[in-house]
Structure formats: C-alpha cells, structure tokens
C-alpha cells in the first residue's frame, strides 16, 4: 500500500516530470503536478457497501451523548463561583469554556451530518434534528445546508466554490505576471510579508478564528464574490434560489428563537452570566470551526482549478486529512482526519468514514493527502504562505 501524502516534510502530488514543465522558479510540486484521472465510480467501488449505510438510531445516540456531556459541563459550571479560592475559579472557568467549546463543536458536526442527510435515511428526522442543533449554536440550518452543499459540489473551483475562495493576483493589488515590474513588486511583497511582525500575523489569525464564522454567515466573508452584498440570512441572497425562500425563513426563525432565549436569560440573570455560560464557549466553537475548515482547504501544495481542469473528484481531493489527537478526533466525530472521504461521499455517515479512508488510501496512493505537521506549524505556514493565486491558468497554486 502506498504511504499517504504528507505536507511540508514530504507532501507530493504525483511528482512526474514532463517536457512541458516550465523552467521558472516554481516549486517542484507545482511544476510537475499532473491531474488525477480517477472516476467517481472506481473510487466508490473501492469502499465496502456497508460504509454507506445510515442509522438514525445510531445518530440519535451520538446526539444524546454529546448533549449529556454539554449538560454535565453546564451543571458543573454552576458550582464554580461557589469556591471561595479565586485561583480555583480562575482556573475552572477557562477549563469549562474550552471543554464546552469542544463538546459543542461536536454537536455542530452532528448537525452538519444532518444537513448532508448522512444522519439517517429520514429527511424529516435529519432536518428536524439539524435545525434544532444548529439553531442552538446560532447557525441558520437550511441556509448553511444549501450553501455548504454548493461548496461540496464545487470544492476547489475558483468561480463556483462557496468558501475559502483564494484571492487572485489582481485582487491583492499586484500587476499582471507578464509585466516586467511584477516580479520586482511581487518579490518586495514577499519580503514584506516575510518580515511582517509575528504579532501582526497573530492578531489577524485571532480575528479570523474567533469571528470568521459569523462573518461568513452574515456577510459572506471569504466566500465567493457575487458582486453584491451576500448573507445567509437574506432570502434573496445570490447564494439561494427562489424555491429556497421558506427554508431561509425557517432558518432565520430558529436563530431568532435562540437569540431571544439568550436575551431573556440576560434580562433574568445577567449579561455576564450568559457570557460565561454561553458566549465564551460559542467563541471557542467559532475558533474550532474556522481552524478545522481553514486547514482542510488551505495549503501551499493544494491546487485550485478553473473550469477547464475541474471535475468533482479532482475538487474533492483538494483537501487535507490531519489529526488533532485521538481525543479531539473523537469529540469532533472524525471531521478532521477523514475529510477526504467526506468530500468524496458526503452522505456517508461519519462513523464509517475511517474504514472508508483506509480503502481510499490504497486506491488513491499519493493523491491521498495527509499532513502530520503539528497544528500550530500547519496554521502558521498556511496563514503566511497562502496569499493569492494567479489570475490565469486552469490549475493554480497559492503564492505568498
């Protein structure tokens, strides 16, 4: 069995020399990249049939477990302020925030399963459970389900993907590559970015990881450019079609109900209480969601495609599996270390994705991408080096 691809210390995307390879200073992986030629039929046939079987009972058991953990953590947090020792309180609250953020991220993932209809064979059960769970986390369920479906149908496509769409050379203010002055300006820009104070990079990372998720929902931050204001809460957003109107209304009502409950709790208890029990863990959920999805789709060695080269399976392979450690991988229901399988077959339930990944590795060989880098290293590398792609070309890679 071919070993999985690795990033940085060894990620290679089928390093095969061709006579057409340019002699520029492009990295070797970009010069020698060849398009994968797998069909979706042969990919599906390598996975055992039972991996596609869905169980509503099993899905509900996972929901019950996660909600039980969230409830127990909430009840434990009600005892924190009873400790007279301030040191215990100062340590216990962050512990609660971190753990509740992890658990609620797992709940978010289960709602995400519902949106893909991989939770059960019942569309009614899927949408009911998904709407409840996502509304609790201030996510417009159907709105995001629709845009996320479009993301899966066009992953890695420069003009059709819905999120983490790279900026182009012209969008970051660089002159055309053919311009003689472009090389000098690009080099100056690269030097500037390399010398950028780490604290500045860290600041923008914090902003993106804490507020990037609501910014995407509210104003389509990092999403596809539609040429006008776009929001998941707007019934006439260009993301949606007229037939989605009532789904958007239902989604908005779910979020409004959750916000109403939070406002009522703030009035009855206090804003500080709601902040400690809900808002801070909610920010941790935002952090995990953006971190996970950013790392899944952003790396210097992953290509993006334009219409001339894109197809579904090529786009689905433009994502990275990695591990956050056994505990987090378990709590996040495999969304991190089985993401390639998920993108190929989004209706496959998460509890079969690990077995499916085992078989996919054998078929895909070096086209299966796994990154063993420490998470901090991977984030820093992608954040600093993935700045833009070229304005032209069917296959483009990130530049810095």
From Swiss-Prot:
GO cellular component, one term: membrane
Reactions catalysed according to its record: (9Z)-octadecenoyl-CoA + 2 Fe(II)-[cytochrome b5] + O2 + 2 H(+) = (9Z,12Z)-octadecadienoyl-CoA + 2 Fe(III)-[cytochrome b5] + 2 H2O; (9Z)-hexadecenoyl-CoA + 2 Fe(II)-[cytochrome b5] + O2 + 2 H(+) = (9Z,12Z)-hexadecadienoyl-CoA + 2 Fe(III)-[cytochrome b5] + 2 H2O
Molecular function (Gene Ontology), one example: acyl-CoA (9+3)-desaturase activity
Keywords from the UniProt entry: Fatty acid biosynthesis, Fatty acid metabolism, Lipid biosynthesis, Lipid metabolism, Membrane, Oxidoreductase, Repeat, Transmembrane, Transmembrane helix
Major subcellular site: membrane
Top-level taxon: Eukaryota
Motif (Histidine box-2): 148-152
Alphabetized Pfam families for the sequence: FA_desaturase (PF00487)
Pathway stated in the Swiss-Prot or TrEMBL entry: Lipid metabolism; polyunsaturated fatty acid biosynthesis
Chain span(s) of sequence motif Histidine box-3: 339-343
Subcellular location, record wording: Membrane
Transmembrane feature ranges: 91-111, 199-219, 245-265, 277-297
EC number from the UniProt entry: 1.14.19.6
Membrane topology of this protein: Multi-pass membrane protein
InterPro entries listed in its UniProt record: FA_desaturase_dom, Fatty_acid_desaturase
Motif (Histidine box-1): 112-116
Domain comment, as recorded: The histidine box domains may contain the active site and/or be involved in metal ion binding.
Similarity comment: family membership: Belongs to the fatty acid desaturase type 1 family.
Function, as annotated: Catalyzes the desaturation of oleic acid (Delta(9)-18:1) to linoleic acid (Delta(9), Delta(12)-18:2).
Name of this protein: Delta(12) fatty acid desaturase
Organism: Mortierella alpina (Oleaginous fungus)
Source lineage: Eukaryota, Fungi, Fungi incertae sedis, Mucoromycota, Mortierellomycotina
């Amino acid at each position: 069995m071919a070993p999985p691809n690795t990033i940085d210390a060894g990620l290679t995307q089928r390093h095969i020399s061709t006579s057409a390879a340019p002699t520029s200073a492009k990295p070797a992986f970009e010069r020698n990249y060849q398009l994968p030629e797998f069909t979706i039929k042969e990919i599906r046939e390598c996975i055992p049939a039972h991996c596609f079987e869905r169980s509503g009972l099993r899905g509900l058991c996972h929901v019950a477990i996660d909600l039980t953990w969230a409830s127990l953590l909430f009840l434990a947090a009600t005892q924190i302020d009873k400790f007279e020792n301030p040191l215990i309180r100062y340590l216990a609250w962050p512990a609660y925030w971190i753990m509740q953020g992890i658990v609620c991220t797992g709940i978010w993932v289960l709602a995400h399963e519902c949106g893909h209809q991989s939770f059960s064979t019942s569309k009614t059960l899927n949408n009911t459970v998904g709407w409840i769970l996502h509304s609790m986390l201030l996510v417009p369920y159907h709105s995001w389900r629709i845009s996320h479906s479009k993301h899966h149908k066009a992953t890695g496509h420069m003009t059709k993907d819905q999120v983490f769409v790279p900026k182009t050379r012209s969008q970051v203010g660089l002159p055309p590559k053919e311009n003689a002055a472009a090389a000098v300006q690009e080099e100056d820009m690269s030097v500037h970015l390399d010398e950028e104070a780490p604290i500045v990079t860290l600041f923008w990372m914090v902003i993106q990881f804490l507020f990037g998720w609501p910014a995407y929902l509210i104003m389509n931050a990092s999403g596809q450019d539609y040429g006008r204001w776009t929001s998941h809460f707007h019934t006439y957003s260009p993301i949606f079609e007229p037939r989605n109107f009532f789904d958007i209304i239902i989604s908005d009502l779910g979020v409004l109900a959750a916000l109403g409950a939070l406002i009522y709790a703030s009035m009855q208890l206090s804003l500080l209480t709601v902040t400690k029990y809900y808002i801070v863990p909610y920010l941790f959920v935002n952090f995990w969601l953006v971190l996970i999805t950013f790392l899944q789709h952003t790396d210097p060695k992953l290509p993006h495609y334009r219409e001339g080269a894109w197809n579904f399976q090529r786009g689905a392979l433009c994502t990275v599996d990695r591990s956050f450690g056994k505990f987090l991988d378990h709590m996040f229901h495999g969304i991190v270390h089985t993401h390639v399988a998920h993108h190929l077959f989004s209706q496959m339930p998460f509890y079969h994705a690990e077995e499916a990944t085992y078989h996919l590795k054998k078929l895909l060989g070096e086209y299966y991408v796994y990154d063993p880098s420490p998470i901090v290293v991977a984030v820093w590398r992608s954040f600093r080096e993935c700045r833009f792609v070229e304005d032209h070309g069917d296959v483009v890679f990130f530049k810095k």
